[in-house]
């Protein structure tokens, strides 16, 4: 009978234990390495996806949506086709072509109530709009889909920009520096027609520059960009986007700032003040003279 050496058995046991530990360590290393590789791979894939994925195009998706364009076409066929033609090509002696005017021009005209016109006249005047903002954007999308042109200004979340257009440095409050720059630009480019406070004025041939108070920020921006009716166009090469915003800041600041001298008399400056002095002041003096004469 063969005898077992205790030292040999002990050595064999240690060898097996050591081999098992090595095997476990290798297994642990493989597990850790696999987890790290998976983590690095997923992280790299995420970074790569972020890098190659374009920015959110919420606004573009809204404007290019086929259902929105179809809705706009239906509205166009009801209200616009008579004057602007079946294919937006315009109708002689009725309405101009809309090809290439862009959604900005449509928004200004329709949202301000100028279009559809109630009657043919020298100039379309502002009135209560016939269509809601959503319907207006649908018509604008249809026109933009057939010729392109200047677009509306949207926020990053896809909403239509309004107060965000109040100055190039707007952060919830109008920046006084924007108002100062906007005032200089307004007096240089706009005051000759709209008056230095934006209250409008008469032009030739029965036309006029409208009061700017009722216009919202998007309307003012699009008016500068598209040049409706008698107004010149101010492209981004003539007035940059920030300069347009600064002009809007000046207009809104002028409207919302109380007159330190009391009633502003329409904001027409020396004209209205002089008329008040002659029309009211002289009458008061005449009445006072007559009263003094009757007492003597």
UniProtKB/Swiss-Prot annotation:
Region (Disordered): 1-27
Any one annotated GO CC term: plasma membrane
Pfam family, one: Cytochrom_C
Keywords: Cell membrane, Electron transport, Heme, Iron, Membrane, Metal-binding, Repeat, Respiratory chain, Translocase, Transmembrane, Transmembrane helix, Transport
Post-translational modification summary for this protein: Binds 2 heme c groups covalently per subunit.
Enzyme Commission numbers on file: 7.1.1.8
Disulfide bonds: none
Stretches assigned to coiled coil: none
Sites where the protein binds heme c 1: 80, 83-84
Predominant localisation class: membrane
Catalytic activity: a quinol + 2 Fe(III)-[cytochrome c](out) = a quinone + 2 Fe(II)-[cytochrome c](out) + 2 H(+)(out)
Enzyme class: translocase
Subcellular location: Cell membrane
PANTHER family registered for this protein in UniProt: CBB3-TYPE CYTOCHROME C OXIDASE SUBUNIT FIXP (PTHR33751), CYTOCHROME BC1 COMPLEX CYTOCHROME C SUBUNIT (PTHR33751:SF13)
Quaternary context: The cytochrome bc1 complex is composed of a cytochrome b (QcrB), the Rieske iron-sulfur protein (QcrA) and a diheme cytochrome c (QcrC) subunit. The bc1 complex forms a supercomplex with cytochrome c oxidase (cytochrome aa3).
Protein's name in the database: Cytochrome bc1 complex cytochrome c subunit
GN (gene name): qcrC
């Amino acid at each position: 009978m063969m005898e077992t050496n205790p030292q040999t058995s002990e050595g064999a046991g240690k060898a097996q234990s050591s081999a098992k530990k090595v095997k476990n360590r290798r297994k642990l290393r493989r597990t850790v390495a696999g987890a790290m590789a998976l983590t690095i791979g997923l992280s790299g894939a995420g970074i790569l996806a972020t890098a190659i994925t374009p920015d959110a195009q919420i606004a573009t998706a809204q404007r290019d949506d086929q259902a929105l364009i179809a809705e706009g076409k239906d509205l166009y066929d009801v209200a616009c086709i008579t004057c602007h033609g079946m294919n937006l090509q315009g109708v002689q002696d009725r309405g101009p072509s809309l090809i290439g005017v862009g959604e900005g021009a449509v928004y200004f005209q329709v949202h301000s109530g100028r279009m559809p016109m109630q009657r043919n006249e020298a100039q379309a005047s502002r009135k209560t709009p016939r269509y809601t903002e959503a319907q207006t954007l649908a018509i604008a999308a249809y026109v933009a889909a057939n010729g392109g042109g200047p677009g509306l200004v949207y926020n990053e979340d896809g909403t239509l920009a309004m107060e965000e257009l109040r100055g190039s440095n707007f952060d919830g409050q109008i920046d006084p520096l924007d108002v100062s720059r906007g005032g200089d630009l307004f007096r240089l480019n706009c005051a000759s027609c709209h008056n230095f406070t934006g209250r409008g004025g008469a032009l030739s041939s029965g036309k006029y520059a409208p009061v700017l108070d009722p216009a919202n920020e998007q309307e003012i921006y699009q008016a500068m960009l598209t040049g409706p009716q008698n107004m010149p166009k101010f492209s981004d090469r003539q007035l940059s986007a920030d300069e347009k915003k600064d002009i809007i800041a000046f207009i809104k600041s002028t409207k919302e700032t109380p007159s330190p001298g009391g009633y502003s008399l329409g904001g027409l400056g020396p004209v209205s003040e002089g008329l008040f002095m002659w029309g009211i002041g002289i009458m008061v003096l005449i009445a006072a003279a007559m009263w003094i004469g009757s007492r003597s």
